[in-house]
């Protein structure tokens, strides 16, 4: 946290992808210099290490069905702690991430929208309960996803036995259009 950060400064959670790390996200994103120049704080949390030694966010992948870690609770508690400890803005706390971190952003929007004011997922989709049980108040979202992504396919894959079935990005965007009561234009 920069020493010169004003009270009520924004806070951004920036989450790594599957097998990634907080340090890797810090180095990859270049976000810290942007935060320092623009007066906001960035939190680079580390996910849990799974049975294969890989870091992950628990978003409902098929091969993590035996995992019981509640990352929504962990990140919500961490947000409250950082807001209180460093006088950061509860109204301006946001979540973003890459791939599995993006999928965790969706989980936070669905199940901790009272702690996170907006999300900006990059190259991720909605899995498991974020897709089947998400019911929230409208929340701003900036979705970034390439059509040539060969890991999280643009068109989705309802037969994926590795990650688990997931919808295409058109369906995900339509879901958020409905959730946020947007008008098509």
List each language-model region with its residue ranges.
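Short, surface-exposed basic-aromatic patches at helix termini and helix-loop junctions that form
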Residues: 36, 110-114, 134-138
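Short, flexible active-site-adjacent loop segments at beta-strand->alpha-helix junctions, enriched
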Residues: 46-48, 99, 125, 147-148
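The feature captures the conserved acid-bearing segment of alpha/beta-hydrolase catalytic domains
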Residues: 117-185
């Amino acid at each position: 946290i920069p020493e010169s950060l004003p009270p009520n400064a924004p806070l951004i959670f920036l989450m790594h992808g599957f097998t990634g790390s907080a340090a890797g996200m810090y180095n990859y994103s270049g976000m810290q210099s942007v935060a320092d120049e623009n007066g906001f704080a960035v939190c680079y949390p580390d996910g849990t290490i799974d049975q294969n030694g890989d870091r992950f966010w628990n978003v409902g992948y098929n091969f993590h069905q035996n995992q019981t870690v509640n990352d929504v609770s962990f990140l919500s508690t961490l947000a409250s702690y950082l807001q209180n400890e460093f006088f950061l803005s509860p109204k301006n706390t946001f979540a973003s991430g890459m791939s599995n971190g993006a999928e965790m952003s969706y989980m936070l929007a669905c199940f901790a929208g009272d702690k996170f004011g907006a999300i900006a997922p990059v190259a991720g989709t909605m899995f498991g309960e974020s897709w089947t049980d998400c019911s929230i108040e409208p929340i701003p979202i900036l979705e970034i996803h390439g059509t040539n992504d060969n890991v999280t396919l643009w068109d989705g894959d309802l037969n994926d036995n590795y990650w688990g079935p997931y919808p295409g990005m058109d369906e995900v965007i339509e879901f958020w259009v409905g959730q946020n009561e947007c008008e098509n234009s």
